[in-house]
Amino acid sequence: ELEQIREGARHHIATYATIPSLYRDGMTDRDLQIEIEREMRRRGSIGIFRCFGSAMEIYMGSLLTGDNAGAPSPYDFALGGAGSQALPLGSNGTPLREGQAVMIDMAGNYGVYCTDMTRTYSIGRLSDEAYRLHELSLEIHRQVMQKAAPGTSCADLYNESLRIVEEAGAGPYFMGTELQAQFVGHGLGLQINELPVLMGRSKDTLQPGMIIAFEPKFVLPHIGAVGIENTYLVTETGIENLTPAPEEIIDLTQR
């Protein structure tokens, strides 16, 4: 099972490496997402993922830019997006404009098991605050995942993330603006969002062999979302990153 997850992660990383080459001037968020979905299918993605607890299968992930990154959604994901009437989640036809962030959170469903990875891109240069918050997301990964090991409380990981965010004065932007998600990670496997949930009310602890996604993200009005998400394996002694793709913000106009 673990080797299938590792193989899926390798395909996931390879797909993300092609994203700058898929961008064209004048695209909307949906245009770019369609090109990414095509590339994922070419590499063996099954094209859908299953969601825990909601008896549903939906398309391959979301792409958020500009104010749509802060749009609330009825679905229990880290960020929402207006989407469409058929599925109020994710891209909604927003033009990709200069100075906006492009957050890509597409599921690595290349077989039976899922991997989950988010990376942030830009159309030209972003504000200094956007780069600061993106670096803060990376710092949260470094600090919090150092504490992750068998027996670690999921609530402690969430609360440690909040502590770092509050010390940086970034609370109003963390995990949304109008509607802020009350978790910072989740398990995954056959479904994209399984137990445990990294949230303040969780009673769960990490156990060897668990696969978790960790996704501290920030939303800036008019700019979009920044931050990353990685999939981690809980080992006997700590944590292993299964999605070690480049983590910096990549300017799509400089491809």
Task: State the predicted function of each range.
Residues 1-255:
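Active-site neighborhoods and metal-handling regions in enzymes and metal-associated proteins
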